[in-house]
């Protein structure tokens, strides 16, 4: 949050964020939630449980079956016909074209993970209304995961009368892309006149959030988070 808010300030934006959904993509699909600078623990210490949300492709299963290391391995095997136990690292190298294998199947394995994660995160962020930061062992394949994730989050839904609108009541931006971040920072800021006065105030009607990938890795982020959490509770 401090990093994104710093970039917004340097870009001349008055927009600031206080809420965050932190996600890990790896052995499983984990998450943590920060609301107004405070870690959401939940009344049963179960806050941020995204792993057990419904799976878009397989509604009878949890989403983690499509957002995890085992999911990438399964989808690659299904699409390529390769019965060998390929690791996510090997599948990524196949996608990059530096290891023999079915490149289309490798890319599709990460894209499907992105789509399924995007569906779950769209549901979660509807309630949280904040930024999303992604880490974990699979985040190294972000170039294949993120486009599908953003496409899913920015997809449309509708009503029985035929009305169509964004599934989220806000636009989702890629904060690691300079052009996308510029649009995110710019928003739709305008000045409005305060009724009964000659004074104008800034107002930005553009609802928007962003997705970024962790630059320091999941382990360091978790350690730093635990440290700050402990410091904040020393005086309580």
For each predicted feature, which ranges?
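A short acidic/small-residue loop/turn micro-motif
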Residues: 42, 46-49
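ATP-binding/phosphotransfer module of carbohydrate and carboxylate kinases, centering on a glycine-rich
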Residues: 8-14, 55-236
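Conserved phosphate-binding catalytic cores of ATP/NTP-utilizing and phosphoryl-transfer enzymes
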Residues: 1-20
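Short glycine-aspartate micro-motif
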Residues: 20-24, 133
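Gly/Ser-rich catalytic serine loop of serine hydrolases
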Residues: 24-32
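Short, active-site-adjacent cap segments at secondary-structure transitions
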Residues: 1-3, 30, 139-142
């Amino acid at each position: 949050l401090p990093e994104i808010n710093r970039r917004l300030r340097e870009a001349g934006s008055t927009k600031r964020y206080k809420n965050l959904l932190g996600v890990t993509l790896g052995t499983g699909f984990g998450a943590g939630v920060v609301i107004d600078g405070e870690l959401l623990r939940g009344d049963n210490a179960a806050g941020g449980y995204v792993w057990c949300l419904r799976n878009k492709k397989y509604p009878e299963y949890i989403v983690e079956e499509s957002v995890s290391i085992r999911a990438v391995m399964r989808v690659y095997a299904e699409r390529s016909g390769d019965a060998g136990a390929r690791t996510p690292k090997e599948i990524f190298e196949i996608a990059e074209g530096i290891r023999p294998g079915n490149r289309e199947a490798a890319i599709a394995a990460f894209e499907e993970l992105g789509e399924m994660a995007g569906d779950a995160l769209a549901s979660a962020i509807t309630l949280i209304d904040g930024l999303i930061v992604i880490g974990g062992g699979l985040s190294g394949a972000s170039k294949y995961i993120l486009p599908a994730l953003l496409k899913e989050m920015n997809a449309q839904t509708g009503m029985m009368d035929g009305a169509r609108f964004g599934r989220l009541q806000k636009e989702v931006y890629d904060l690691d892309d300079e052009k996308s971040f510029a649009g995110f920072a710019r928003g739709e800021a305008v000045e409005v006149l305060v009724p009964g006065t000659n004074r104008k105030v800034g107002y930005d009607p553009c609802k928007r959030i962003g997705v970024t990938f962790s630059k320091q890795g999941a382990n360091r982020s978790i350690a730093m988070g635990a440290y700050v959490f402990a410091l904040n509770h020393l005086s309580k």
